[in-house]
UniProtKB/Swiss-Prot annotation:
Keywords: Repeat. Belongs to the UPF0339 family. Duplicated subfamily. Residues 89-111 are annotated as: Disordered. The keyword Repeat applies. This is UPF0339 protein ACIAD0721. The keyword rRNA-binding does not apply. It comes from the Bacteria. It comes from Acinetobacter baylyi (strain ATCC 33305 / BD413 / ADP1). Sequence repeats lie at residues 10-58, 61-109.
Length: 111
């Protein structure tokens, strides 16, 4: 099964999206957006940029946990991964976003 996007609304009324792999695991999380349309535009940007390896910023957090950001052509962060136990695990996460990021399936959980 291929992955999908979910749009949800935070308690403060802002919107975010996540990209889930086919197994239901969250592999990318967006920032918070004031408008639902902005979250939808963020999804479109992931769909466009996720297959380009140059768009991934491979990082290590202060707690020494590897993670990554997916950036648009304008260098703005579109989404951020979880923290991983190793760089190898992070790189598998990037491959998962590449494989699932182009999906057109969007589940709107905002009601």
């Amino acid at each position: 099964m291929s992955g999908w996007y979910e749009i949800s609304q935070a308690k403060d009324g802002q919107y975010r999206f996540v990209l889930k792999a086919g197994n239901g695991e969250i592999i990318l999380t967006s920032e918070l957006y004031k408008a639902k349309a902005s979250a939808e535009n963020g999804i479109a940007s992931v769909q466009k940029n996720s297959s380009d390896d140059a768009r991934y910023e491979r990082l290590v957090a202060k707690n020494d946990k590897p993670y990554f950001n997916l950036k648009a052509a304008n260098h703005q962060v579109i989404g951020t991964s979880q923290f991983y136990a190793s760089e190898q695990s992070r790189d598998k996460g990037i491959e998962s976003v590449k494989n699932n990021g182009t999906t057109a399936t969007v589940k709107d959980l905002t009601g």
